[in-house]
């Protein structure tokens, strides 16, 4: 079965996330970018279940998180910073330090409006 056929169809499709949770990490690796997209809004019903699923990957998520920071989408960045990232091992936070420092030192106007520094400073203080 093609794993992409199980991807959530909409923000309410918790059933698909439950099916994906039964799959191996090897199977899920190919759809990590698509799964990350479901973290664009932490208010979506499937956001937290997808986040729980992604936690299985730990350090492997770093390039995908860095991609989110490169999009300069402050809402998506916010939900990464307030949801997924604090739940990852401290090692991941260390790996993301340059990205977090960039947001603090050279934020975009929208990152300033989203007040991402309020979330980032306590994280950096853990290091």
Mark where each language-model region is.
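Amphipathic alpha-helical scaffolding segments comprising HEAT/armadillo-like alpha-solenoid repeats
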Residues: 1-4, 26-38, 59-69, 90-104
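Structural detector for internal amphipathic alpha-helices that build alpha-solenoid repeat scaffolds
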Residues: 4-5, 10-25, 37, 45-57, ...
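Surface-exposed polar/charged interaction patches
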Residues: 23, 71, 103-106, 126
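Short inter-helical turns and helix N-cap capping residues of alpha-solenoid HEAT/ARM repeat scaffolds
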Residues: 42-43, 72-73, 108-113
């Amino acid at each position: 079965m093609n794993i992409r056929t199980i991807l959530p169809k909409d923000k309410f499709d918790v059933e698909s996330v439950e099916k994906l949770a039964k799959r191996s990490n090897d199977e899920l690796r190919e759809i990590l970018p698509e799964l990350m997209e479901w973290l664009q809004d932490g208010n979506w019903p499937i956001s937290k279940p997808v986040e729980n699923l992604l936690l299985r990957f730990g350090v492997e998520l770093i390039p995908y998180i860095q991609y989110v920071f490169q999009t300069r989408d402050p809402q998506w960045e916010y939900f990464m910073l307030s949801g997924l990232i604090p739940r990852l091992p401290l090692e991941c936070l260390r790996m993301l330090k340059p990205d977090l420092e960039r947001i603090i030192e050279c934020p975009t106007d929208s990152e300033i409006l989203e007040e991402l520094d309020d979330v980032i400073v306590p994280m950096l203080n853990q290091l």
